[in-house]
């Protein structure tokens, strides 16, 4: 039997030691040249190609690398560059590219000046499907034209060829490219498809002439709910591309199953089809029945989005009968691009040997596919020892006392509906809370964090290195906390926060104190551009060995007679921003986290903290891609929040916070959370996001953000008061709190002081009528 090819759809592009991050920041900071940045990028690409080849991949991608974002790259390649950036044709300057990604304070970025002197804004950024990666949203005009403005896909194919590696270039497909973008006039981007497809055909022709016999063309939107018109767009686009010749196309779908889009995908004139068989393992037989026999099927059987070792023996049992009859029809691949996992476990030093044996990062996942290919295609005995090693590690994991905690399982089995309900309705709770807190109309507060200055970061680093004692660090943090409390009192904020100076990250801070979590030193993944994150790993049952925030909350409360909020990260966000164990349903893991937080909430209340905030910025991010699957998710997500928050007395006030999002499709769930107060980002939308709350007649209190914490601009008090008057249109003034859009951790103190003073003044104006 011939060897079944091993393909990768994309790999992490940040480098083994985050070289891309540091190269970008040096360039943006004026510390290196364009040539030095491009040389660093070329080195990462070369290392990635070599790593994949050494790990056993026979089909290696090119053009999966990007300096910032692959969707932005596609927009630039196709000439979809908004007029504001000043591109007039020819080669696209690197600074124009970065202005689209990050905005620019420089007038030269767009070739003309602006009335406000603030340069040009970045394109909008949003989540890539249901992952924690962010992409830049392409913008189109109604009369948008496209042209081949960059030959990056061809150049990187040639670059790999010079290295002796024949690659399969990767392109984001035309229909997904348009669907992921937006038209400035609010029209349907798919109307632009007839103008776009010829440019794709031109690019594919150039790749063919360069020697690319196959091209991977990603159409992840095929796993979404589509209208018949949208399905027709796929047919139109790929019929047109097929008519022009060009290389063979491997149409890649991922993040779910084709579902009711299968007939459309099966009928497209493409040579290959990639399937996500991790998210949707049951679709394979239907695809094999529907697709032409000559269609190559890429089997996405290794999880490209999580870091757990694959059960190779189980996969062999499952795939053996399928590939046996026609091995030449199949390729083996990860479920999606490996962008979403760290690059290489071999450089990781932060996890113990046992836990390490349960993990697989990008390189190891390619190695797993190579083992699978050998076992399916050749003599299994040649790799049997490696298969056995994986099976032993999985068996140890399944039976480990580190993973399974009977006490946690017992608590979950004893859950009752009453545990997820407050003892009194909101109307009664509000009266009791007002008696306790005695707050004015339009009460003011902040979302939680205050600026993490260089001094705070230096003290944390010094403590971590042993250069500053724990006692010294604790004293420093207490000093910062007291300054924050005193300053909030001086300007007249009503419900205070302690500032969170002791916290490095809103998820990491808590997960470091919970059982069942582990942390890496080199497990970096790209969030966007140069921003990299190290998601914690949930490997076992989650519990809280001891209180996590009570000492800091009670210290801050001891400094003032005003209420100080206890600050927690909610269970859904703790789940969404972690690598989650794959041996339990996600909702079960979330309930475990909810119980740990429930204990913390109870301890805060017992310690005299009367206002407790449980942030859930990731609640909407967890929504399944398919509409039919969303109600079940929202049911357990809301239940977990309520499990965490409902064990308190009615006079204890529960707050939550959600970041910038569309709320229309989840407003029922937000109301069902039954938080006494919700704060949301609304300033950038000029309170437009409140429409959903007005239409729903949202019953509880709400704090619409009155200034954008992402901007250094400090709006005057009158402007904030105007926003609050807009909020009054449709909301009862008694419902309205006054707060910023989000936490202030990344801002400078000079900005924060003026902004919050103006915010307090705006609230005073509202009280005065």
Curated annotation (Swiss-Prot):
5-methyltetrahydropteroyltri-L-glutamate binds at residues 18-21, 127, 531-532, 577, 621. InterPro entries: Cbl-indep_Met_Synth_N (IPR013215), Cobalamin-indep_Met_synthase (IPR006276), Met_Synth_C/arc (IPR002629), UROD/MetE-like_sf (IPR038071). Gene3D superfamilies: 3.20.20.210. It catalyses: 5-methyltetrahydropteroyltri-L-glutamate + L-homocysteine = tetrahydropteroyltri-L-glutamate + L-methionine. One of its GO terms (molecular function) is zinc ion binding. The active site is at residue 710. Pathway: Amino-acid biosynthesis; L-methionine biosynthesis via de novo pathway; L-methionine from L-homocysteine (MetE route): step 1/1. Coiled coil: none annotated. Keywords: Amino-acid biosynthesis, Metal-binding, Methionine biosynthesis, Methyltransferase, Repeat, Transferase, Zinc. One of its GO terms (biological process) is methionine biosynthetic process. L-homocysteine binds at residues 447-449, 500, 615. Zn(2+) binds at residues 657, 659, 681, 742. Its cofactor is Zn(2+). Its EC number is 2.1.1.14. L-methionine binds at residues 447-449, 500, 615. Binds 1 zinc ion per subunit. The keyword Amino-acid biosynthesis applies. The keyword Signal does not apply. Catalyzes the transfer of a methyl group from 5-methyltetrahydrofolate to homocysteine resulting in methionine formation. Belongs to the vitamin-B12 independent methionine synthase family. This is 5-methyltetrahydropteroyltriglutamate--homocysteine methyltransferase. It comes from Chelativorans sp. (strain BNC1). The lineage of its organism: Bacteria, Pseudomonadati, Pseudomonadota, Alphaproteobacteria, Hyphomicrobiales. The gene is metE.
């Amino acid at each position: 039997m011939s060897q079944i090819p091993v393909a990768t759809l994309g790999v992490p592009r940040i480098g083994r030691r985050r070289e891309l991050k540091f190269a970008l920041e040096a360039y943006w900071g004026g510390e290196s040249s364009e040539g030095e940045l491009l040389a660093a990028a070329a080195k990462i690409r070369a290392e990635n190609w070599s790593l994949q080849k050494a790990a056993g991949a026979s089909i290696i991608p090119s053009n999966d690398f990007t300096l910032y974002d692959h969707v932005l790259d596609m927009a630039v390649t196709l000439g979809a560059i908004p007029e504001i950036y000043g591109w007039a044709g020819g080669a696209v300057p690197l600074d124009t590219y970065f202005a689209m990604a990050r905005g620019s304070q420089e007038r030269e970025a767009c070739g003309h000046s602006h009335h406000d002197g603030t340069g040009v804004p970045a394109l909008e950024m949003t989540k890539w499907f249901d992952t924690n990666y962010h992409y830049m949203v392409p913008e189109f005009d109604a009369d948008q034209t496209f042209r081949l403005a960059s030959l990056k896909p061809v150049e990187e194919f040639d670059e790999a060829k010079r290295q002796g590696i024949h690659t399969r270039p990767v392109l984001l497909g035309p229909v997904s490219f348009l669907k992921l973008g937006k038209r400035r006039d609010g029209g349907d981007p798919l109307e632009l498809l007839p103008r776009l497809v010829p440019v794709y055909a031109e690019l594919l022709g150039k790749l063919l002439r360069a020697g690319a016999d196959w091209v991977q063309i990603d159409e992840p939107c095929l796993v979404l709910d589509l209208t018949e018109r949208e399905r027709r767009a796929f047919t139109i686009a790929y019929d047109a591309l097929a008519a022009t010749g060009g290389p063979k196309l491997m149409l890649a779908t991922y993040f779910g199953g084709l579902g009711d889009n299968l007939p459309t995908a099966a009928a497209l004139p493409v040579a290959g089809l990639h399937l996500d068989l991790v998210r949707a393992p049951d679709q394979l037989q239907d695809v094999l029945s529907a697709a032409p026999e000559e269609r190559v099927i890429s089997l996405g059987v290794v999880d490209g989005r999580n870091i757990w070792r694959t059960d190779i023996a189980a996969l062999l049992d499952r795939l053996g009968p399928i590939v046996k009859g026609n091995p030449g029809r199949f390729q083996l691949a990860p479920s999606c691009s490996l962008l979403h996992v760290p690059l290489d476990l071999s450089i990781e030093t932060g996890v113990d040997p046992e836990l390490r044996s349960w993990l697989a990062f990008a390189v190891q996942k390619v190695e797993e596919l190579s083992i699978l290919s050998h076992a399916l295609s050749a003599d299994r005995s040649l790799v049997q020892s490696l298969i056995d090693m994986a099976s032993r590690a999985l068996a140890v994991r399944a039976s480990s006392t580190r993973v399974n905690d009977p006490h946690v399982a017992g608590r979950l089995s004893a859950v009752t509906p009453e545990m997820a309900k407050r003892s009194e309705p909101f109307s009664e709770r509000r009266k009791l809370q007002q008696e306790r807190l005695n707050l004015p109309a339009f009460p003011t507060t902040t979302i939680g964090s205050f600026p993490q200055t260089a001094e705070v970061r230096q003290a944390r680093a010094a403590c971590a290195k042993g250069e500053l004692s724990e006692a010294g660090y604790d004293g420093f943090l207490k000093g910062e906390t007291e300054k924050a409390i005193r300053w909030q009192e001086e300007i007249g904020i009503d419900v205070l926060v302690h500032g969170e100076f002791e916290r490095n990250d809103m998820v990491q801070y808590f997960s470091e104190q919970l059982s069942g979590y582990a942390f890496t030193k080199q497990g970096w993944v790209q969030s966007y551009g140069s921003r990299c994150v190290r998601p914690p790993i949930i490997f076992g049952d989650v519990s809280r060995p001891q209180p996590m925030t009570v000492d800091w909350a009670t210290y801050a409360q001891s400094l003032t007679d005003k209420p100080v909020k206890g600050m927690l990260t909610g269970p859904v966000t703790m789940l969404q921003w972690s690598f989650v164990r794959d041996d339990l349903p996600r909702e079960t893991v979330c309930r475990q986290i909810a119980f740990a937080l429930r204990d913390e909430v109870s301890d805060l209340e017992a310690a005299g903290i009367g206002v407790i905030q449980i942030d859930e910025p990731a609640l909407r991010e967890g929504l399944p891609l398919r509409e039919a699957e969303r109600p079940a998710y929202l049911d357990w997500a809301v239940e977990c929040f309520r499990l965490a928050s409902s064990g308190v007395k009615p006079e204890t006030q529960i707050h939550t916070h959600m970041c910038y999002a569309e709320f229309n499709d989840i407003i029922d769930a937000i109301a069902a959370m039954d938080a006494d107060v919700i704060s949301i980002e609304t300033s950038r939308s000029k309170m437009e996001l409140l429409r959903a709350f007005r239409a729903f007649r949202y019953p509880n209190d709400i704090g619409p953000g009155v200034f954008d914490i992402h901007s250094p601009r400090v709006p005057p008090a009158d402007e904030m008061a105007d926003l609050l008057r807009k909020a009054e249109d449709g909301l009862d003034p008694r419902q309205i709190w006054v707060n910023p859009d989000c936490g202030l951790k990344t801002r400078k103190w000079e900005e924060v002081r003026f902004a919050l003073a103006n915010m307090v003044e705006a609230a005073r104006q509202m009280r005065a009528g």
